[in-house]
Amino acid sequence: GSKSYWKVWWDRDVGDEKASVINVDDMNSQKTEDLDEVHIYKKIRSELGILPVRLVYSPEGMEIEKYELNTDLQKAMLLYKYKEQTVKYTMYMNNADSSFGEKETDKLTDEFLIISDNGVEIKVKEYEEKDKKVKRYEAEFEYAGAQYEIKGVVEKEEFEKILKNLYFSK
């Protein structure tokens, strides 16, 4: 994978806060010019054994930019671009170590639940980003033995629409 991309992305995402950085040495990283999400989801299923929950709805202009699979950590990360921001979708097996760099410097302004059509509880947290007057949303849920996280600066209505339209593979 391109470490320079990660360094830039990580610095931008975390700022000067101390964060535990994900080891990207053994991740297969792909730029996704000609890759479609269906192909990525199939790869996640075959290589990681995760039944991927698919993003069926995405706001206009939100496009997948890059994805990474780490078979050692049993983890997949899809990065989307949306209005000059990055939306990060991560999935990993429950037994996998989820040592994400958590930044708790933003102010938690709201927490709520969204229940998907098949009864999965999705916990959502709304943060106000320091220095920027924007809201960032983080959603977490569990399905078929895996953990899922979707994080990004997206309008609340759009974020809820993404979550309400998730497709849960059987």
Predicted segments — roles?
Residues 144-170:
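Surface-exposed amphipathic alpha-helical segments
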Residues 1-13:
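Membrane-interface helical sensory segment of bacterial ECF anti-sigma factor regulators
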Residues 17-142:
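Short, solvent-exposed recognition patches
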Residues 1, 122, 163-165:
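Generic hydrophobic/packing signal
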Residues 7, 43-46, 161-164:
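Charged/polar, solvent-exposed surface patches and flexible loops
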